[in-house]
Curated annotation (Swiss-Prot):
It comes from Bombyx mori densovirus. This is Putative non-structural protein. It comes from the Viruses.
Length: 167
């Protein structure tokens, strides 16, 4: 089972850092990113509101994005689970950590894992966009945005999950 930790100030090898969210991985596993199924529901709702606003209301794009992420992360925070990314990881380590939740998901709590895997496309959009907007001028962010490795690893991990009956 995953051990949940919140309010962690120091960065451990198995704890990732992102504002508002943190999850502690089991000691035998690499760093994990898992969004609980309840959190996924809120993400999907927020994305629905985003598309309605973007396509039907004449609102500046940056205002819509700001609203979207406020809603998404307030809802995830209300769910009581937190997730953190580590800015100290190299890009390749960061990508491996990000995807490890999918690639070894059959070992852990099925409700949490299925909530993550069945909504990978939604979460992919949310987290990728969030990172890009969080540090728009960052060299690291630009590298992640345009990295074929990011897309390839993501696609292979989802395919692995489907092949192994996780989805």
């Amino acid at each position: 089972m995953l051990r949940i930790c919140s309010g962690v100030d120091r960065v451990d090898r198995d704890c990732l850092i992102l504002p508002w969210i943190d999850v502690k991985a089991p000691p035998e596993a690499p760093a994990f990113i898992i969004v609980p199924s309840a959190g996924v529901k809120y993400v999907e709702m927020a994305l629905g509101w985003f598309f309605k606003l973007f396509f039907f209301v004449s609102t500046p794009f940056d205002v819509v994005i700001d609203f979207l992420f406020r809603v998404v992360f307030i809802c995830l925070e209300l769910d009581g689970r937190f997730l953190r990314f580590s800015s100290s990881l190299s890009d390749s380590d960061w990508l491996d950590c990000w995807l490890s939740a999918v690639s070894v998901s059959s070992r852990y709590d099925s409700e949490i894992v299925v909530g993550w895997v069945s909504s990978t496309n939604v979460l992919w959009v949310v987290f990728r966009s969030f990172i890009c907007f969080m540090e728009p001028n960052s060299v690291r962010t630009s590298a992640i945005k345009s990295s074929p490795l990011f897309v390839n690893h993501f696609t292979k991990s989802v395919a692995w999950s489907k092949l192994n009956g996780v989805v």
